[in-house]
Amino acid sequence: MKEKFLRELADIQTGPFGSQLHKEDYVADGTPIVTVEHLGNKMFSEQNLPRVSNTDKNRLKKYVLKQGDIVFSRVGSVDRCSYVDQKHDGWMFSGRCLRVRPTREIDSEYLYYYFCLEETKQFVRNIAVGATMPSINTKLLGEVVVTFPELEQQKRISGILSAIDSKIEVNQKINDNL
């Protein structure tokens, strides 16, 4: 097993600041923007997504998500995160979020599941600053120590966990229809 700081395994980016993107920039049809409210268990909630035009998307291209990215809440529930799958590739993330883009040294799904561990979530909550509203930034998140095996084993682990998540999702849909 290896150990490295997250900053050594991923590019960590804060979302656009308020001066870069305003509510007036939102359009009815366009590229969806993930906000803290849309972070769920692995997947994003797709309800009431703000959207921006292609012009704004091109202007703010460093905030465009790619498959394999992990999006974190920067304020409030700082231990919440979601995984960017193929369906959400090309979406954007808001200023109240942080985007983690893993290097090739670590499997992105393995890293996502690592952040789902209760001990990792607790560590993130503990490093947050702010008495009334906890918050994290790129520097603080980069201080998380990640323990990981060889890449092949990471992929096996994340494959098993992803298959379990898929079965849970199917069961939830069945239960919703009862």
Label each PLM-derived region with a short phrase:
Residues M1-F17, E143-N177:
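Non-catalytic DNA-recognition/assembly elements of restriction-modification systems
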Residues T35-V36, N54-E118:
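A short beta-sheet element
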Residues L39, S77-V78, V129-G130:
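Short glycine-enriched loops at secondary-structure junctions
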Residues G90-L98, I106-E109, V129-S158:
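A short glycine-rich beta-alpha junction/loop motif
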